Structures are given as C-alpha cells and as structure tokens.
C-alpha cells in the first residue's frame, strides 16, 4: 500500500512541531542545504527557453522543468523516477522540487551580512566592541584594522589609515598583522573567546558604579550571552557562502511579444555572481591590490543590496530607475510575506455582492442569489449529481451545472439546506463583523440581509457590499452554526448590550403605535381581550393612540416547581393602556409582564426591553421576540404614513426678539472694547458666550413649541399634549435626527468653527427653513469640509490603533477556570464633581467577588467570595446601599501565559461566565478599537467659550447627609471667623446615615467653607464658595509683611486700573526681566513677629516664606500687618495660559502608548516632610525629608505651581507639583491598582464623552498586557542580567525553579510599556516580526537562537496551525496529552523509528524540526 501511495506522491502529512527555532546558518549548513553551486549569471537560453547549465535556473541544480522528464528528453515517465540523466545531469522527479531546492554561491572573498552590521544597535559592533563607523570603514576598504599586534605597541582592533599602515610596516616590518575588509573582521570575530568575555563583563558589572557603563556592559553582555547560550559562532555573521533561493520563488515569466518579466531577485543575484566571478578571475591573475580591493568592495555592496537593498548608501535600481526589491523587502511591511500572505490570505469558495434589505427573513437567515449559490456550492452539487446517478463523471456533472438544468436547482436547494454560510462586511472591526446565516435562495443578484443585524455589521443599504464564505468541512459547519449563527450573537461583546436593536423605521412604527393621545376616537372604552381591540381597530372604531381599558393575559413564571407543572401560567388583569400597546402585547414572550410595553417605546426603551427579555426569557424567546418586534414595527410605520414637510419645521415667533436682544448686547461690548475697558480677548469670549446662549434660547423656544400642541379633551377643555409633529416624533423616538439637527432646521444654526477648531464670532442666525445668505453659507462650508477631512484621517488612525491593540493582546486567552488568587480591586461608584457618572452596579456586573459581600445592616454574608455577580446580585447590592465591593480583575490574575475565567468574569457577548479558550485579548482590543472612528480627532482649546461653562464658584450637596472632610483637607480661620481652605487636594464627602459615601466634591485652595466636618445638611445646601476668576495666595500665619526681591521694574511692575485708579504690583515673567541677576530671584514675603524676628514654621528652624508666581497681583503693602487666612496676592485665572486638552482618539492612543506628558506633575518619591532648599537659577529646590531623615531633592521650574508648602507631611505618591499625571510615576509610586484606575478612568472619560459604552475589563486586559514585562533589579542566582526586561511569566517560572533548587530568586520591579513597545518585546519573534520593524526583530532573534513556542494566536496563524483558542485550544490540549501518553508507551519503539526515518531532507523544512530539544 505504501509503495502505491508513493507512486502518486500523495501530499505528505506535514511535520508536527511545537516550536520554531531561528538561528544563524554556518557555511557548512548552507552548503548542506544546497544542491549545487550556481556559477554563471545566465538565466535561460533565449532561443530554446531552456535554463542554462550552472545558471540561476539550472535544471541540474534545482530540478526538472516538467514532471518526471529530464531536460534533454532522454528519460520521460514515472518509471525512471530517481534516475539522474547522464547527458544533462538532471534528476527525474517532480517539477515542484524547484520550489524547495536551494543552490549556493561560493564567495571569493567573505562578506559581512548587512543586517548584523547596520541594523541598530549593530550586533557586529557589540561583539567586537567597536563603533559602527570603524567597522564600516574596515569592511568597505577605507581603513586597516590590527588583528595581531605581536610585539609592537599597537593595540588589537586599532583602526589605521592606509598611510599609517605603510608607515607602521616600515617601522615594524611583519611584527604585526593588519587586514582590510571582511577577512579582517572575520579574523577578529574568530579570535574572541566568548566565555572569557562573559566572565570578564559580569565581574566588571558588579564592580562598576557608573550608570552609563552599567548600561553599556549589560547590552554587550546580553549579546555575548546570547551567542554563548545558542551555540552560534560570531564569525557566522560574515558570509563565506551565499545561499540561492529556489528558482520558482523568483520566477521568470515569458510575456507575449517575446519579453520576459522577472523577479528583482534575479537581477540582484546576477550582479553578485558577475562580481564574484570577476573577483575570482582577478585573484587568479594576481591583479594589483587596489583593483582587487575595489572588486571586493563591489561584491560586498552587491550582497548587501541582495539582502537588504537601500539599507546602506543608495539603493540599486533596475532598468526603470526604481529600487530593486531585495529579500528583506519581500518579508517586511504591509505587502510583505507576513502581512500579505501569511496573516491575510484570499480564500476560495467566497463571493461578494451588494446587499439589500430582507425584512421577511428570520434572524438566522440571509438571502443568497441563486447564481452565487450555484457557484459557491459547486463541488457539493457535483458530488450529489454523481451520487444520484444523474452524471457519471465530474465532467458530465460540470456540463449539467453549466446548462442549469432543473435537476440542478433541486439539488442546490437540498445542498444548502442547513449548511450555514458566513457573511462579512469590511471593515471587520469586531467579531460581529462576520456572522453565519442559513442561506435562502432568492432571484436577483443582491444578497438580502436581515435588518436587525445591520447594527452589528454597521451596514446600510446605500450600496454596501458584503462577502460570502462557505465553511466546507463538517467541523467548520458545526462551529459556524453553534458559535457564529446570527441568532446566537445578540449581545455586543464590548458592553453586553443587545446588538439586535431595531432602528429607524422600526423604531418609528413602534413609537407611533405606543404613544397616547388625549381624546382619541374611542377613548375610555373597555375591551374583554386583545382580539376585540384588534377587531375594533380594523373597523376604524378606535385609533391607535386612544386610551382604553383592556383585559390582558400575561404568562408568568410558575411558582410551583414540581414535576409536570407547566413553566408558565396565565394571569389575567385589566390594564389602562392604549390600543397600539394592547395590539403589541400579542407578541410578548412568556415571562415578561405587560408593564414593559405599557409606555411609549423609544429606541432606548426598546433596547432595554430586549435586554430584559434576554435576561428573563433566554436566547430563543428573545430572538423570536426581536423578529416579531421588527415585523410589527415595519407594518405599523407603513400604516402610520409619517412624512415631513416644510410646514413641520415650526420657527418660534420669539426668535426675532431673542436675536435682536443679543445683537444689542454685542454692540455694547464692542463699544466697551472701543473705549478700552475690555481686552480683545475678553470681548471675543463674551461675544461667543452671548451667541451660544442665544442659540440655546432659540433652540429651547423652538423645542417648546414643537414638542407640545394644544388639544381639546373629552370634557371640552383645552389642554396641551405631547406633539404628533412628524419631525418631533422622529427625533424623540430616536429613529432619525436629534434636537441639534432640528434646531438647525427651525431654530438658528448658531456659531460655526474654523478648521483649526476656533469659533467664528459671527453666528448664523438663519436656519435651513429660512435659508442662508452667501456669507452664512460660506462660513458654514468652513467647518463642514474640515469634518470630511477629519473623517478620512480618523478612519486610518483608528485602524492603526486597533492593529496595535490586537497585536499586544493577541496571545491572551482564557486557559483555566480559576487561578485561585486572593487579590482584586475595590470597586466604587465613579463620582465626578458630585455627579455619579457610573453606578457601582454597572462596574461590578459580571465580575467575580474576591471577598464575601456583607450586608452592612445585619453583617451577614450575602454572596460568598467566588460568586459571579449577575443582575439580581447587583440589584440587591445596590438596594442595600453597599458602596464598595472587592472584585477579581484580569490585572491581578496569577495565571501564567493566559488568564483564568474567574478573574475575567462574564463573557459579555454571551452573558455567562467566560469559557476556557475564549480569546479575551483580541475581544478587548476590538471593543476598544471598534468605536475609534466615532471619537473626535481634535484637541480642545480650553479658553474662551469652552471654559466659561466649566467655571464653578461654589459646590452644593445633592443629597441629605453628613459632611465629612478627607484627611488631606486643611483650613484656617481668619479674622472674620470664616474658614479658608489652604489644602490643594481637599475633598468634602457627603455620607448617609449608615456612613456610606454618597457624593464627593473637590474643594479648591482659597475657598470659604460654609459647613464644617460632621455637620448634618439637607440637599441643596452650599458647602463652600470661592471666586472663580482669581486664585488667592493665603497666609497661614499672622505677622508683619516683609517683601523680599519685590523691586519695581525688576521683578514686579506697577499697574494702574483705568477705571478705579488704584495701583497694584504684578509679578513679571523672569524671561522678560532685564539683567541676568534678576532672572533667578523670586519675589516673596517673609513675616515678622512683634519683636521684628522672622516667623518660623512651628517645630522647625525654617522661616515662613511665601513665594509669588508670575502674573500674581500683590494686594498687601510692605510693612502691613496681616492676620491668619488673609489674602496676600491674587492670580487672575484669565492669565493662566489656555492649555490644550488632548481629546478623542489621540488621547486614547497616548494613554495606551504610556507616553509621559510634556509638563508632567511631580509625585512625592517618599513619605516625609516638605521643606524648600536653596533656589538655583530658574528652578526652586524642594526637599522631602523621609522618616529615616534622608533628604530627597526635587528641582522644580519656577513657573510650576507647587501644591505643598513648608512643613507639610506628604505621602509617597502624592502630587507635589501640579500637572498632568505620568503613568510611569503612578506605577512606580502608587502601584498597579492605582495605575489601572488611572488608565481605565482616563480612557473611559474619552469614550463617555462620545456616548460610547465599553466595559472596564477590556481596558484592564490591555493594561495587563502593558505590564507583562518586569525589570530585574537583583538577579539572585537566576540566569537574568540586572536591568534586563523579561516576560513576567518567565520570571516567575525561573523564580519557582530557583526556590525549588534552594537558590536565591531574582527580585524585580514592574515596568509599564506602551502597546507598540509591548508588542515588539514579546517573546514570540514571529509575532513581533509580523508587527513592525521586521529586520530588527529577526536579527535579534537569530543571534539569540530564539525559540518560538507558538503560544499566541498570530504565530500559529503564520505557521498555519489551528490557533490555541476556542476549539483549537481543546485540539492542542488533546494532541499534547496524546503525545505524552504515546511518548511513555513508545519510548522503546521511538528509538528504532528515529533510526528508520531520519530527518526529512527537504531544505525548506529544515528550520522547522520540533524545536523540542
């Protein structure tokens, strides 16, 4: 049997392997791969089109052109297989060996591999400890390098010019050896004793103290140790033999007209061979040194450009002046091997067409055009035709199908029954972008799509196209049906909301049907059942919106759980409702009460309704319900016949007066500006403010008029009811349009923005109903075009962010049920400015509790640790008012190389605990990247109009309770008896009667407190007030003011107020001061006591110093007596520079890339007491003395705002200088939990602003990946180097091993890497190479002899295995288990088998042996 199979050379079962190893090939290895040396640059004979012998396409080396036929035609047919023809030397075998047989070129002079020379940091440079510049000069024959100094005073590796060399030769004769070119470098590499060097470096590392040296040594040590560990010899970085790619991989294709198209590689190889042959000839002829040298340099350059064209010097160009595509270009970049052919392949059995709406389909169906189906399912039809005996051969079957005989259509129906197909709409931004459907054959050429899945695909029917793919194997069909069928994917994986929500006309229909009208036809009637209502409606006795009373039968869950008892029992009750709602009650699934329908159904309500159905009635009932909702919606919208016309856009009559008043106010400001009372900036801000307020007012008047209408009720009185205006209904229901759009139609368009985001102060007072004049139209085109340009940029940027996110998380898969960790994070409701932005229930829903949840009133355990908190649980927790729950989080999961299900919690797309094998990393990346296109690109200029709205001047309680101050709150009582806040980060909390936090408010510096700690207050009570326009500088001590460095014209300037004539002193910017000396001084105040001594800070020797910052208006006079809490100076808020707040997509990218902000705030490194040291030029010195008495200094620029004061005690990680937080500092000083809270909250802020919901755990998953490397601080007895960054899991594994062996484990600190960095520093070199910087990644991996264990998804896709996620994870687990048991069973046999089979001799397979050694 085996012989028979061999005869036809069946596709062999590919090698099973668990890892891939990469390394440098030794010259002998390259020769062993080769099937012969390529000696001539010729390719094919242009007359006979046969390959030239010994040329680049030689049949003798690479194999026959035609299957089983030698070149001269002496041997043809299978029977001669394996014969080598004596005439032409060609082996008789398959032609496809030309894809795998390699050749080689023996180089006449060695050549350095450009990747190891020029890819930074230069590996050759590191091994030789020489600079790149020097090595290059040697390699390209510009200088000599000393190889063996002998007895001379020269040093090894010394560089000398030609002149030097000749002088030294005259001086020392042949006492020493110096060489040029790659030979010299090879000699140096051979001379290196790696073990010795490593020992030496390790001792030097221990003994040195300088940072720079440590860094340098560690780098070099890493490279040398890599060589040592991998057993690769450094001299292999210099090539003596050049391998030649198999000819089929660099084809030469005849075009019509006798021309040839060829791969660039052939050109590059040809140059190498030409130069190599010329060099050989020159060496034989003993040509002069200078000619040989030139030839050697040209050979080096030819090999360089073959390997990586354009890396050094100018790129080699072909006939048409474009750079040739070298081997490196073949693998890197978007069009390279990795991204083009391995990660994204075109697949067979697929087609695409335009989509149209299919309202008659069920949720799990799609309409497939007959012709498409016929083409896609061809093989199945052929098979069926043969089985049925209609056709005897495939050829006959083909004919039948082509003629489209009736029997073929019958068979097609049969074939596609229960055979799901996958539909995909590009761009596939999340996993719902591909779903499976059962095909329904339709006439026409467009694919029909169910309306409810449009939201998931983000599809509309304005010409969108979709692709169809057919899963072929039974396993694929099974997976498509169970995992991907549209009716099994009804929730968004990003947030757990339903994805099958109706939109547009469906919503409009349902909304119209569930509205109620006063005094509709038939109001007040009572009906015995829904069928009676329907009959009355059909006979036009009642209107849809009339209020009626109806007896409605609901199916409720049966309390009786005994055997045979029905699950649902009917319950009849009388409801006051409307006709439309009663009719809709027909489609309610059992288990839902009628009350969910008994209200106007807007889009949000419908979404909530479907969600409730899913939680209460399960998946099947929900899908059926959604389908019926859709059908009813369409039907009712048609019956309603809603249309819009110009008269529906009601312009409010008050508009004229409102706009007129505003114009008057603007005129008044212009007048003030002309008389110099206000600055240009203030005028602009005020004008913009006026117009935005006006726009609001007009909009409000318009909405009031539009949203209600007068109506006569049954008793004949006039009253107002919600309007049935078509435009209003569309916006109110959420079907189409929004209040803002209606305002533009019927109110006023308002202010427009310039492309740079600044606001044009002339508003557009017209609306679209009145029409715009030319100027107004021109102004509005400005912003509109910017919008379009933005969208294009946004899409690209968003796509790139998604790609980076996917890359960093692609190997994160749930691999076990529970890691057993007792760590977690404490979740609280998210409160901002006293508002609850996100309730606790939303934050803990679907998480696993890590500690018991206790009822605060009775102290009994509600939910044990390890419980998955579902809807009922979080509702109960909310009802009891528990304000903090400790839950598990992906960040603290202790699973290595993956995550555990308990730390992840609920799979949001399914609503149950996540399954083992779920690729949660990719899902997280998609959930964050998918809404990326909805985020804005723009950065917000805070200044002018925008900040005006944000200025608050007081804070008031929103609920009843008790005031509590945070520990950081400090205040003093001034002479008037007012409490003035002197802490920068004080907060006031409002707690309820059990002591649970209800609100939290920040109280700024200088605020006056109106309520003290422990005061009981009612909602609406003011807690504190402050002046929003200025920020005071307040003294905490009393005394007499003594100015220091306050010199008029030097550090301060006198300003006289135009209106009041009072003068104040203003501190001027150090940069604008005259002399050098005055730049470093800082105006400040000291206080003197009654005896004229300086007031000291209690308990210290320091005098009280209060510094004034730039722009401060000093309000006290020298020698003035001041009391505690008095204001010394004010800083106008206006003069604070308008700072740009990065918003939208760039902000998200900034957070995930972990970039340090420009003027980052400074955090205290230690816990201790603050004091100010001696100021240096332009900087002030802040000293923190820790509890042991050590001093830690910080230099702070003068213009920065210091948040602490002399003598204040600060905690480690507390902010001491104002500014945006630096995530690296947060991690270092406050730990992982604080960092995660920071990143999660910041990212969520951006998305929340756009109204996008994303679950926190997705962001946490990404933060986990950003923290996956650790830096070794002390290597203990491990194999790591101090300062090295390693994978956390590796480190833990190694430490476990050390502890098991009783050695000293390594200690480490956490490192935060940006997502790009993290993707590139992964342990898998295949994944990193396919992401970015392919050359660098591969160079590094080759030297280290890296081994890729194929843990992630990407690596496995690239090598073509099943991915280790989902069903693939189970497959690999089973395979490994089987291998383990087999290995034990067959240990004996294995030894003999290995002897039989040996290793496969196909050179292409060579690097792919199981690297399990």
Curated annotation (Swiss-Prot):
<feature type="binding site">
    <location>
        <position position="903"/>
    </location>
    <ligand>
        <name>Zn(2+) 2</name>
    </ligand>
</feature>
<keyword id="KW-0808">Transferase</keyword>
<dbReference type="InterPro" id="IPR006592">
    <property type="entry name" value="RNA_pol_N"/>
</dbReference>
<keyword id="KW-0548">Nucleotidyltransferase</keyword>
<dbReference type="InterPro" id="IPR042102">
    <property type="entry name" value="RNA_pol_Rpb1_3_sf"/>
</dbReference>
<dbReference type="InterPro" id="IPR044893">
    <property type="entry name" value="RNA_pol_Rpb1_clamp_domain"/>
</dbReference>
<dbReference type="GO" id="GO:0003677">
    <property type="term" value="F:DNA binding"/>
</dbReference>
<dbReference type="InterPro" id="IPR007081">
    <property type="entry name" value="RNA_pol_Rpb1_5"/>
</dbReference>
<comment type="similarity">
    <text>Belongs to the RNA polymerase beta' chain family.</text>
</comment>
<keyword id="KW-0460">Magnesium</keyword>
<dbReference type="GO" id="GO:0006351">
    <property type="term" value="P:DNA-templated transcription"/>
</dbReference>
<dbReference type="Pfam" id="PF00623">
    <property type="entry name" value="RNA_pol_Rpb1_2"/>
</dbReference>
<protein>
    <recommendedName>
        <fullName>DNA-directed RNA polymerase subunit beta'</fullName>
        <ecNumber>2.7.7.6</ecNumber>
    </recommendedName>
</protein>
<dbReference type="InterPro" id="IPR007080">
    <property type="entry name" value="RNA_pol_Rpb1_1"/>
</dbReference>
<dbReference type="InterPro" id="IPR007083">
    <property type="entry name" value="RNA_pol_Rpb1_4"/>
</dbReference>
<comment type="function">
    <text>DNA-dependent RNA polymerase catalyzes the transcription of DNA into RNA using the four ribonucleoside triphosphates as substrates.</text>
</comment>
<feature type="binding site">
    <location>
        <position position="460"/>
    </location>
    <ligand>
        <name>Mg(2+)</name>
    </ligand>
</feature>
<dbReference type="GO" id="GO:0000428">
    <property type="term" value="C:DNA-directed RNA polymerase complex"/>
</dbReference>
<dbReference type="InterPro" id="IPR038120">
    <property type="entry name" value="Rpb1_funnel_sf"/>
</dbReference>
<dbReference type="GO" id="GO:0000287">
    <property type="term" value="F:magnesium ion binding"/>
</dbReference>
<feature type="binding site">
    <location>
        <position position="462"/>
    </location>
    <ligand>
        <name>Mg(2+)</name>
    </ligand>
</feature>
<dbReference type="InterPro" id="IPR045867">
    <property type="entry name" value="DNA-dir_RpoC_beta_prime"/>
</dbReference>
<feature type="binding site">
    <location>
        <position position="900"/>
    </location>
    <ligand>
        <name>Zn(2+) 2</name>
    </ligand>
</feature>
<comment type="subunit">
    <text>The RNAP catalytic core consists of 2 alpha, 1 beta, 1 beta' and 1 omega subunit. When a sigma factor is associated with the core the holoenzyme is formed, which can initiate transcription.</text>
</comment>
<keyword id="KW-0804">Transcription</keyword>
<feature type="binding site">
    <location>
        <position position="819"/>
    </location>
    <ligand>
        <name>Zn(2+) 2</name>
    </ligand>
</feature>
<keyword id="KW-0479">Metal-binding</keyword>
<keyword id="KW-0240">DNA-directed RNA polymerase</keyword>
<dbReference type="Pfam" id="PF04983">
    <property type="entry name" value="RNA_pol_Rpb1_3"/>
</dbReference>
<feature type="binding site">
    <location>
        <position position="85"/>
    </location>
    <ligand>
        <name>Zn(2+) 1</name>
    </ligand>
</feature>
<dbReference type="Pfam" id="PF04997">
    <property type="entry name" value="RNA_pol_Rpb1_1"/>
</dbReference>
<feature type="binding site">
    <location>
        <position position="70"/>
    </location>
    <ligand>
        <name>Zn(2+) 1</name>
    </ligand>
</feature>
<dbReference type="InterPro" id="IPR007066">
    <property type="entry name" value="RNA_pol_Rpb1_3"/>
</dbReference>
<dbReference type="InterPro" id="IPR012754">
    <property type="entry name" value="DNA-dir_RpoC_beta_prime_bact"/>
</dbReference>
<dbReference type="Pfam" id="PF05000">
    <property type="entry name" value="RNA_pol_Rpb1_4"/>
</dbReference>
<keyword id="KW-0862">Zinc</keyword>
<feature type="binding site">
    <location>
        <position position="464"/>
    </location>
    <ligand>
        <name>Mg(2+)</name>
    </ligand>
</feature>
<dbReference type="GO" id="GO:0008270">
    <property type="term" value="F:zinc ion binding"/>
</dbReference>
<feature type="binding site">
    <location>
        <position position="88"/>
    </location>
    <ligand>
        <name>Zn(2+) 1</name>
    </ligand>
</feature>
<dbReference type="Pfam" id="PF04998">
    <property type="entry name" value="RNA_pol_Rpb1_5"/>
</dbReference>
<feature type="binding site">
    <location>
        <position position="893"/>
    </location>
    <ligand>
        <name>Zn(2+) 2</name>
    </ligand>
</feature>
<dbReference type="GO" id="GO:0003899">
    <property type="term" value="F:DNA-directed RNA polymerase activity"/>
</dbReference>
């Amino acid at each position: 049997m085996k012989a028979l199979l061999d005869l036809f050379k069946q596709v062999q079962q590919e090698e099973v392997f668990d890892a891939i190893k990469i390394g440098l090939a030794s010259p002998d290895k390259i020769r062993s791969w080769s099937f012969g040396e390529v000696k001539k640059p010729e390719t094919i004979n242009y007359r006979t089109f046969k390959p030239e012998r010994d040329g680049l396409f030689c049949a003798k080396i690479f194999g026959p052109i035609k299957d089983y036929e030698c070149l001269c035609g002496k041997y043809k047919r299978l029977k001669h297989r394996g014969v080598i023809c004596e005439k032409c030397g060609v082996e008789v075998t398959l032609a496809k060996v030309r894809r795998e047989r390699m050749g080689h070129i023996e180089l006449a002079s060695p050549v350095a591999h450009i990747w190891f020379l020029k890819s930074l940091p230069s590996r050759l440079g590191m091994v030789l400890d020489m600079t790149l510049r020097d090595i290059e000069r040697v390699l390209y024959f510009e200088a000599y390098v000393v190889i063996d100094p002998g007895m001379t005073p020269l040093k090894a590796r010394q560089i000398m010019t030609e002149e030097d060399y000749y002088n030294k030769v005259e001086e020392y004769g042949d006492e020493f050896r110096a060489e040029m070119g790659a030979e010299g470098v090879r000699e140096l590499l051979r001379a290196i004793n790696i073990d010795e060097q490593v020992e030496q470096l390790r001792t030097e590392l221990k003994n040195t103290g300088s940072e720079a040296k440590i860094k340098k040594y560690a780098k070099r040590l890493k490279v040398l140790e890599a060589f040592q560990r991998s057993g690769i010899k450094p001299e292999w970085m210099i090539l003596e033999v050049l391998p030649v790619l198999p000819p089929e991989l660099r084809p030469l294709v005849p075009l019509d007209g006798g021309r040839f198209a060829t791969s660039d590689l052939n050109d590059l190889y040809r140059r190498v061979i030409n130069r190599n042959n010329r060099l050989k000839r020159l060496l034989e002829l003993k040509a002069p040194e200078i000619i040989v040298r030139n030839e050697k340099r040209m050979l080096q350059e030819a090999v360089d450009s073959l390997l990586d064209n354009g890396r050094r010097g100018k790129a080699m160009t072909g006939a048409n002046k474009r750079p040739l595509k070298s081997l490196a270009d073949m693998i890197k970049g978007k069009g390279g091997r990795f991204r083009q052919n391995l990660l994204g392949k075109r697949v067979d059995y697929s087609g695409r067409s335009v989509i149209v709406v299919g309202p008659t389909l069920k949720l799990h169906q799609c309409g497939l055009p007959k012709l498409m189906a016929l083409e896609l399912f061809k093989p199945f039809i052929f098979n069926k035709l043969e089985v049925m005996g209609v056709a005897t051969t495939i050829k006959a079957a083909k004919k039948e199908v082509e003629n489209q005989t009736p029997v073929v259509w019958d068979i097609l129906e049969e074939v596609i029954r229960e055979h799901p197909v996958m539909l995909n709409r590009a761009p596939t931004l999340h996993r719902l972008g591909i779903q499976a459907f059962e095909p329904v054959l339709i006439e026409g050429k467009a694919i029909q799509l169910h309306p409810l899945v449009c939201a998931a695909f983000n599809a509309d029917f304005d010409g969108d196209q979709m692709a169809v793919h057919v899963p072929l194997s039974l396993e694929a069909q099974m997976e498509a049906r169970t995992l991907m069928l549209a009716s099994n994917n009804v929730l968004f994986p990003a947030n757990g909301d339903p994805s099958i929500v109706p939109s547009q006309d469906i919503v409009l229909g349902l909304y119209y049907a569930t509205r109620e009208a006063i005094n509709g036809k038939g109001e007040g009637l009572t009906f015995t059942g829904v069928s009676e209502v329907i009959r009355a409606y059909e006979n036009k006795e009642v209107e849809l919106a009339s209020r009626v009373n109806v007896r409605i039968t609901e199916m409720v869950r049966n309390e009786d759980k005994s055997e045979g008892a029905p699950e649902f029992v009917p319950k009849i009750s009388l409801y006051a409702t409307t006709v439309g709602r009663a009719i809709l009650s027909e489609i309610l699934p059992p288990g839902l009460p009628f009350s969910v329908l008994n209200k106007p159904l807007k889009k949000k309500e419908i979404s909530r309704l479907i969600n409730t159905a899913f939680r209460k009635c399960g998946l099947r009932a929900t899908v059926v319900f959604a389908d019926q909702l859709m059908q009813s919606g369409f039907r009712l919208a048609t019956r309603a016949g809603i249309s819009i016309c110009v008269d529906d856009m009601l312009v409010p009559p008050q508009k004229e007066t409102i706009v007129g008043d505003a114009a008057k106010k603007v005129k008044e400001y212009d007048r003030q500006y002309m008389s110099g009372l206000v600055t240009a900036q203030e005028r602009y801000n005020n004008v913009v403010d006026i117009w935005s307020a006006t726009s609001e007012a007009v909009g409000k008047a318009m909405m009031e008029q539009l949203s209600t209408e007068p109506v006569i009720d049954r008793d004949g009185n006039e009253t107002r009811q919600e309007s049935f205006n078509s435009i209003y209904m569309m916006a109110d229901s959420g079907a189409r349009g929004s209040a803002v759009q209606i305002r533009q139609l019927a109110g006023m368009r308002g202010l427009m923005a310039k492309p740079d985001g600044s606001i044009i102060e002339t508003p557009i007072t017209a609306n679209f109903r009145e029409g715009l004049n030319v100027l107004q139209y021109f102004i509005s085109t400005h912003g509109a075009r910017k919008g379009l340009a933005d969208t294009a940029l946004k899409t690209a940027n968003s796509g790139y962010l998604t790609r980076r996110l996917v890359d960093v998380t692609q190997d994160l898969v749930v691999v076990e049920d529970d890691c057993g960790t007792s760590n977690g994070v404490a979740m609280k409701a998210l409160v901002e400015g006293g508002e609850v932005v996100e309730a606790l229930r939303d934050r803990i829903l679907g998480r696993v509790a890590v500690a018991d949840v206790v009822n605060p009133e009775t102290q009994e355990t509600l939910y044990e640790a390890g419980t998955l908190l579902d809807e009922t649980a979080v509702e109960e927790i909310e009802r009891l008012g528990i304000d903090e729950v400790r839950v598990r989080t992906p960040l603290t999961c202790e699973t290595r190389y993956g995550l555990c299900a308990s730390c992840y919690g609920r799979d949001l797309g399914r609503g149950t605990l996540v399954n083992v094998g779920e690729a949660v990393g990719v899902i997280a990346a998609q959930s964050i990247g998918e809404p990326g296109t909805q985020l804005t690109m723009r950065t917000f200029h805070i200044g002018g109009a925008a900040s005006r709205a944000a200025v608050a001047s007081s804070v008031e309680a929103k609920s009843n309770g008790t005031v509590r101050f945070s520990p950081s709150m400090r205040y003093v009582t001034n002479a008037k008896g007012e409490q003035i806040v002197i802490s920068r980060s004080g907060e006031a909390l409002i707690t309820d009667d059990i002591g649970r936090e209800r609100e939290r408010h920040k109280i700024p510096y200088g605020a006056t407190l109106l309520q003290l700690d422990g005061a009981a207050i009612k909602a609406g009570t003011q807690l504190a007030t402050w002046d929003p326009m200025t920020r005071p500088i307040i003294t905490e001590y009393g005394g007499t003011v003594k100015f220091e460095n306050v010199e008029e014209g030097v550090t301060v300037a006198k300003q006289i107020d135009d209106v009041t004539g009072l003068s104040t002193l203003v501190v001027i910017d150090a940069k604008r001061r005259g002399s050098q000396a005055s730049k470093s001084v800082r105006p400040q105040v000291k206080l003197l006591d009654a005896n004229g001594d300086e007031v000291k800070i209690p308990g210290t020797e320091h005098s009280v110093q209060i510094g004034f910052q730039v722009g401060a208006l000093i309000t006290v006079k020298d020698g003035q007596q001041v009391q505690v809490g008095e204001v010394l100076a004010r800083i106008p808020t206006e003069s604070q520079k308008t700072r740009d707040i990065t918003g939208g997509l760039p902000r998200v990218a900034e957070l995930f890339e972990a970039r340090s902000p420009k003027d980052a705030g400074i955090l205290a490194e230690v816990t201790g007491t603050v004091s100010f040291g001696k100021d240096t030029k332009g900087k002030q010195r802040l000293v923190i003395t820790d509890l042991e008495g050590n001093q830690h200094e910080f230099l702070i620029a003068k213009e920065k705002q210091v948040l602490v004061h002399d003598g204040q005690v600060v905690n480690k990680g507390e902010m001491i200088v104002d500014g945006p937080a630096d995530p690296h500092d947060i991690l270092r000083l406050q730990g992982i939990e604080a960092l995660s809270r920071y990143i999660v909250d910041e990212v969520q802020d951006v998305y929340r602003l756009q109204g996008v919901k994303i679950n926190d755990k997705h962001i946490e998953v990404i933060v986990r990946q950003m923290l996956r490397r650790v830096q070794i601080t002390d290597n203990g007895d491990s194999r790591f180097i101090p300062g090295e960054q390693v994978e956390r899991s590796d480190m833990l594994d190694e430490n476990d091993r050390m502890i098991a062996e009783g050695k000293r484990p390594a200690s480490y600190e956490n490192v935060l890497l940006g997502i790009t960095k993290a993707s590139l520093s992964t342990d898998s070199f295949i994944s990193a190479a396919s992401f970015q910087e392919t050359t660098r990644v591969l160079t590094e991996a080759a030297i280290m002899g890296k081994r890729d264990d194929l843990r992630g998804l990407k690596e496995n896709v690239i090598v073509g295995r099943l991915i280790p996620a989902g069903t693939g994870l189970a497959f690999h687990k089973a395979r490994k288990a089987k291998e383990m048991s087999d290995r034990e069973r067959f240990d004996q046999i294995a030894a003999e088998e290995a002897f039989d089979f040996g290793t496969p001799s196909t050179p292409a397979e060579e690097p792919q042996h199981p690297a399990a050694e």
